[in-house]
Amino acid sequence: MTLLVPFDGSDLAEAALRRAREFASYRDEAVVALTVVPEDESFAEERGWIEPGEPYDPEAVCTEFELRIAEIDDDVTFRCEHPPPSEHPTATTIDNVTQTIRRVAAELDVSIIFVGSENAGRVSMPVSSVGGPLSTDAKYDVHIVRRVE
C-alpha cells in the first residue's frame, strides 16, 4: 500500500508530507508526493507558483517541486501530473485536479491520502480545496492536516 500526499508547495502540504512520512515509518508503506500542475495560469498565480505577469511553465513548476520534495525527504517518491482538459463545460480547475488525484490514488492502490488544507472537510466546502471532494471517496482514508506545527 501507499500513502499519497497532494503537494502544492504550501506550508500545510509540507506538514502533510512530514506527517505521512512519520506514519509510513510505522506501517512500512511508501510515500508518494503528487503535484498536479494544470495549464491554467491563474491557478498557478493563486497558488503562488508564479507572480502575476510572469511566464508560466508547468514543467518548471514540476521540476521546482521535485527538488523541494527531495530536500524535505529523499525517500519520498515524487510524481507530477498534468490534468487533461475536462469534457464537462462546468468543471473547474479544482475539479480537474481532484479527478487527477483520485485517478493516481486508484492506480497506486493508496491506503491514505494526507491533505494539507486550512479549510478542507468543514461543513461548507470551498471550491479552492481538494480536501473536501477527496474525503468523500471511501476507497481510502483521508488525513487532513490543518496545522503546520
Sequence positions of predicted segments:
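Amphipathic coiled-coil/heptad-repeat helices and related helical stalk/stem segments
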Residues: 16, 97-98, 127
